[in-house]
């Protein structure tokens, strides 16, 4: 998530604009009762937009999440990256009355921030402010989203930043993220999900300021927005916000549907040949018809968490590949598309997809251990898919996982984000309550049935970032054993198991493994 923290403008405190001096919020009309800790929804009408509010008078902050049902899947062909760039231009070009520099100076004294996130199907603007500063902050936030400046100078600046994010950051310096995006590109070949939200080189080069303005009018519109607010806001404020955001234009057309991902049989491997890579990054996955709306999803979430809960030592993959063998920093698996929220270990809310995938993430390993790490991950995944999780383990891990969910919702903003996700998926029971209830009834038989229905496919896609793709392809296709290269001796129980892992069958043929030069990846 991009976040605009305006600490760089400390020297400008003396020149804070008069626009900071806002009168108290005028809240017209009847108020809405807000039971503590509960979500209140105001439906869309001619005079307002859809709104979800969570009032908490004991909070010291007010959190905003302005969620649009639009993402990179609606980038026009040849303009890949347009939605994300339009989002940045909305948040970071200033307002009709303020330049970006003036806006930054106005926000600094409030220690306020505005963040954005664009994924395949959703874009969210996030903001947090001290409750005491709500009137003047909201006046700015409203103008940022409703009347952005969209000027030439900001377009040049943000367009160049997007190009740098693609070439220098994603492709140049972040092989972990690159591997995940390469996996999406392989799973969703010739599909609207097939390019990263930041775009492609050709797409970014072709985008004009007029394209940004047209995309904003086309998809950042009234019928696609839900405004979320949480915290210590005054009575009636939610109604005012819903009415203010009705100034967004009407949506000119319905949202287009999505095609099904292409199908293949067995394992399909894409190796991105990156000569400068000093390690090997691996991502594995497959598309699924499951989303959070599915009855099986809580069980699938339990299983993937047991095998590889994100950044937790409780997972099988973490224990066997990192703890026992020291191959990397961690190994995880997910029942839906996952992104980490900043530097935390928690999931980023408001990245819901209409089509989902199950994935395994093997953090970068030494090149000498790339094939072994891949085989190890496949072995443990297959083992638990085939043999299941014992009842005693379900009870033990279920207790931990149920309590862990509370940590996911520690702030007003994150609780609001989860509530918006519940609304997106049309869930009547809040996320935590739903999964805890499902897990309390889970046993080995029920879990095995869910795994068999939803996770037992042999048709998986593997994306690898490697420095010598040709050599790695030859090794994988040959079927030759790939023993690990350790820096220190390992216990006999580990080395005995290594004999199994290093020979884990992949069944790959030459045509199953494709090499993509790094220069060609996301070029167009």
Regions found by a protein language model. Name each.
Residues 16-18:
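C-terminal motif of bacterial Sec signal peptides marking the signal peptidase cleavage site
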Residues 20-27, 103-215, 260-262, 375-379, ...:
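Acidic/histidine-enriched segments that form metal/cofactor-coordinating
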Residues 23-43, 166, 184-225, 252, ...:
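Histidine-acidic residue clusters that define the catalytic metal-binding segment
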Residues 23-32, 189, 226-290, 466-519:
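An aromatic/glycine/proline-enriched structural segment found at the starts
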Residues 35-37, 46-48, 58-65, 77-82, ...:
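Extracytoplasmic
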Residues 64-128, 194-198, 311-340, 352:
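M16/MPP (pitrilysin/insulinase) zinc-metallopeptidase core fold and M16-derived inactive scaffolds
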Residues 155, 159, 164, 168, ...:
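Non-catalytic, conformational "gating/processing" segments within enzyme and secreted inhibitor domains
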Residues 161-182, 260-279, 324-328, 332-343, ...:
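Short acidic/His-enriched helical or mixed secondary-structure segments at domain edges of catalytic enzymes
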């Amino acid at each position: 998530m991009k976040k605009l923290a305006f600490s760089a403008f400390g020297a400008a405190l003396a020149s804070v604009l008069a626009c900071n001096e806002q009168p108290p919020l005028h809240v017209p009309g009847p108020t809405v009762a807000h039971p503590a800790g509960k979500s209140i929804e105001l439906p869309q009408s001619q005079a307002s937009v859809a709104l979800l509010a969570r009032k908490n008078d004991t909070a010291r902050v007010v959190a905003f999440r302005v969620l649009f049902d639009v993402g990179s899947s609606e980038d026009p062909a040849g303009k890949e990256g347009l939605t994300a760039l339009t989002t940045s231009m909305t948040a970071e070009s200033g307002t009709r009355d303020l330049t970006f520099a003036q806006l930054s100076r106005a926000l600094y004294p409030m220690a306020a921030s505005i963040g954005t996130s664009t994924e395949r199907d959703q874009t969210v603007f996030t903001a947090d402010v001290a409750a005491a500063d709500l009137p003047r902050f909201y006046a700015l936030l409203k103008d940022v989203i409703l009347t952005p400046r969209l000027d030439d100078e900001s377009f040049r600046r943000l367009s160049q930043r997007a190009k740098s994010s693609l070439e220098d950051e994603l492709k140049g310096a972040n092989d972990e993220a690159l591997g995940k995006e390469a996996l999406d590109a392989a799973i969703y070949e010739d599909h609207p999900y097939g390019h990263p939200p930041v775009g492609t080189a050709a797409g970014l080069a072709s985008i004009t300021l007029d394209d940004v303005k047209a995309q904003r009018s086309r998809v950042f519109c009234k019928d696609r927005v839900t405004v979320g607010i949480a915290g210590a806001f005054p009575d009636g404020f939610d109604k005012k916000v819903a009415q203010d955001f009705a100034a967004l234009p009407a949506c000119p057309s319905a949202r287009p549907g999505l095609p099904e991902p292409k199908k293949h049989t067995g394992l399909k491997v894409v190796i991105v040949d990156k000569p400068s890579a000093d390690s090997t990054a691996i991502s594995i996955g497959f598309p699924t018809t499951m989303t959070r709306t599915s009855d099986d999803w809580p069980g699938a979430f339990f299983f993937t968490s047991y095998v590889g809960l994100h950044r937790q030592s409780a997972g099988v993959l973490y224990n066997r590949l990192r703890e026992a063998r020291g191959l990397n920093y961690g190994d995880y698996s997910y029942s839906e598309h996952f992104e980490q929220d900043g530097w935390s270990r928690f999931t980023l809310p408001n990245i819901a997809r209409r089509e989902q995938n199950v994935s395994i993430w093997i953090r970068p390993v030494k090149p000498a251990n790339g094939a072994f790490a891949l085989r190890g991950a496949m072995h443990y995944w297959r083992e638990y898919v085939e043999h299941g999780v014992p009842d005693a383990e379900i009870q033990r891990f279920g207790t931990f996982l149920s309590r862990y969910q509370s940590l996911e919702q520690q702030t007003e903003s994150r609780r609001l984000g989860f509530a918006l996700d519940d609304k997106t998926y049309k869930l009547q029971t809040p996320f935590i309550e739903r999964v805890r209830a499902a897990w309390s009834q889970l046993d080995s038989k029920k879990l095995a049935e869910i795994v068999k229905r939803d996770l037992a496919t042999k048709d998986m896609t593997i994306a690898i970032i490697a420095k010598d793709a040709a050599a790695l392809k030859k090794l994988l296709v040959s079927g030759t054993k790939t023993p690990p290269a350790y820096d220190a001796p390992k216990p006999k129980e580990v080395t005995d198991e290594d004999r199994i892992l290093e020979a884990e069958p992949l069944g790959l043929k030459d045509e199953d493994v494709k090499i993509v030069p790094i220069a060609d990846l996301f070029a167009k």
